[in-house]
Amino acid sequence: MSNIDEPTGVPEPARVESWLRTLVGFEDAQVAGVVALTDGLSNVTCRVKLTEAPVTAAVLRIQPTRGIFEPYDILRESEVLNHLAGTAVPVPGVLASESDPRFLGAPFLLLEFIDAAHMPAPEADFATFAADLPAFAAAVASIHAIDWRAAGLDFLGVPSSAAEGFKGEVEAVARRMSAFGCADEPLLNRALTALLPTTPSGRRLALCHGDPNPFNYLFRGQQLVGVVDWEQALNSDPRSDIGQLVSLSHLRGAATYGPPSENPFVQLYEASTGERLESMELFRARWLFQLGVVYHGWKVYGTEPWFSWAQVEDLLTRSLAEL
């Protein structure tokens, strides 16, 4: 019998407890419950309620076999979190990591539980979303300001230039197209043909979150207390993170399509950093391309996308026309 509840991916409490008791300090731990946290769309992420343990709650993240950000390496995420501990970016502490798949069927992490709410989707609570936006922009800027070499994050890979980083990101998305059943999709191939030979203007390399969507930023009131989901972290052009957020703002209806310089997040980010973001049309197109591939990936793996293919067609077509 499987140790995983197949429909949800949630492991049986007894199996988690058995593993926990192998850890120093958790020898008498009891698992009172394992509950799926439903906001994540890649790693299986659960809240574990504990008694007779150093903490009363923790987060369990289990590496998936397949998904929209494949290939996965959750132990890499653990290393990112350990290197970010003590920096200006608040992240959950790593309580333990496990590479042996015999326990829960795949490698996994046990993380500190941060009792805080993530930013809401703008269509669900625009007032709170707008109130959190300045702190959110400042948080993304603070990630990009980290001295990633001093923090020991060069293990993430160091492209020879920001332009090479951009190309590598496009190629990584293209490698998923066959598995996602969209290798022959005309619009995505047109985007790939346009993006691959394009060289963005010079820009510094920075630590990029890789998936800076608002659901990964935790707030108490309007104070940021945690940044989670670092599976896609990389050293690249920081405009990559901004391009994702501009693209998501269009898909969620938080900002109308227009010059990126008029996007509220771009303006707040620029105010926080004192830098002007150039060539954002290119980075918007690159992320609309990726989100088009993600759309097909979700379909393949049985998740109904929250945005439509018609939206992708409209936005990506307009974006490519600007290049």
Which role fits each region the language model picked out?
Residues Y295-L323:
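Helical subdomain adjoining the active site within ATP-dependent kinase catalytic cores
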Residues L207-H209, P214:
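Catalytic-loop of the protein kinase fold
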Residues R239-G274, W287-E304:
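Active-site activation/catalytic loop segments of kinase-like enzymes and analogous catalytic loops
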Residues L205-L207, V225:
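Conserved protein kinase catalytic-loop anchor
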Residues V35-L187, P200-R204:
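ATP-binding pocket architecture of kinase catalytic cores
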Residues M1-E27:
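Juxta-kinase regulatory segment immediately upstream of eukaryotic protein kinase catalytic domains
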Residues V228-A233:
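Activation of the activation-loop gatekeeper triad in protein kinase-fold domains
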